[in-house]
Amino acid sequence: MSSPSPSSEAAAAHHHHHQRRQHAGAAGGSGLVPLAALIKEEARAERPMGSGSRICARDEEDGGGGGGAEGGRRWRRPLLRYGCAAQSKKGEDFFLLRTDCARPSTSSSSSSSLASSPPHTFAVFAVLDGHNGNAAAIYTRDNLLNHVLSAMPRGLSREEWLHALPRALVAGFVKTDKEFQHKGQTSGTTATFVIIDGWTITVASVGDSRCILDAQGGAVSLLTVDHRLEENVEERERVTASGGEVGRLSVVGGAEIGPLRCWPGGLCLSRSIGDIDVGEFIVPVPYVKQVKLSNAGGRLIIASDGIWDALSSEAAAKCCRGLPAELAAKQVVKEALRTRGLKDDTTCIVVDMIPPDQTIRHPSPPKKINKLKSLIFRKKTKDHPNKLTKQLSAAGMVEELFEEGSAMLSERLGNDSSGRRTSSSLFTCAICQVDLEPSEGISVHAGSIFSSSSSKPWEGPFLCSDCRDKKDAMEGKRPSGVKVL
């Protein structure tokens, strides 16, 4: 799949160089601006997509060739309005704003229909919070999207494309980490990567740069999981089982101070991109969640821990309700600085998904009696079903399509009996996309023949020997000090 050209970016730069565009309707000051007036003005403007801080709503043909409620029908895309604000302390926060990324049409589409139909597009928003330098954050910002798209099969309908996206995100994150580590630089980064296609939101994340959804009616829900060792018991157990040590910093006299860290390295996070000087049990495999909003719309807040160390999810959502996206992002940063001061890089992106054919208010404070006030998505288990997700879904606000947070590549890449053959009948590595002879590919399930899983080690997806070595290291199957470079 061809990747979007850099020249089509709406914005993709460090916050020191980011110049935000402001519409005439919001230029009068920093006070509250009626959303109805903004939408009416933008509807008259009819600017092309990617100009300014919005996406024009329009019909789009699914072209799916059947399957799904939207297959073969035209549907209305939401209007996207976004804003970004940041304050720098260390110069290690970066972000990505792209509103005109293209996915190819299905192979069954005729050339005449392609000429008359609008392009199949999606938007990408990302926050990258670097540590130990900014090299990993910059590299991830510049390469992660291309790596995700290279892992997507060609000729998919929109429904199939969305279904394949979680797996491609896993492959893209791991490839980005692997290629950055080849550079030998020691920095690392969190990554929260949000893809919006129509009303469907797919979020992949490592680290603690959180993404929340503020739905109409005041329901605030998490679309990410924090990979901080201090709060995440499952991640602590995984790291120790893989050969890492978890503890606090020891000072003279034997006292322990600060948050829980992973040793060697002293990192507070259990998942990141980069960090070559830390054990391989610090993995780049992302937590992925995919949801579909109702046409009531909603607001996304994506931010680095400079925000979340100062504000709870509910406080961040509440402090900017009633404001348009650009002012909302500034308000969240302002509130975080007021609460805690500038102790870390602080970055916030706000994205509003607005129905295209009706006047909708920005998310407003909930009523005094509202059972959906603090709905939080939690990881589903057999013993504890996700009742909160069911409540939110029953309210017609959001439909959960996918959720997975396992760090095991064999679980995340699934089964593929075809092995993704290329046109030359070679196999393709599911991570780095290099061509493999049939005798060279190693199944991601190899070594699990006696497990209770239904996976078969002679089936794909397949990995090259380099990616297989990395998989084994991440799962504690070889000494973490032995790096694959």
From Swiss-Prot:
It is an enzyme of class 3 (hydrolase). The keyword Nucleus does not apply. Residues 13-23 have a biased composition (Basic residues). SUPFAM superfamilies: PP2C-like (SSF81606). It comes from the Eukaryota. Disulfide bonds: none annotated. Mn(2+) 2 binds at D129, D305, D344. InterPro entries: PP2C, PPM-type-like_dom_sf, PPM-type_phosphatase-like_dom. Mn(2+) 1 binds at D129, G130. PANTHER family: PROTEIN PHOSPHATASE (PTHR47992). Belongs to the PP2C family. This is Probable protein phosphatase 2C 3. It comes from Oryza sativa subsp. japonica (Rice).
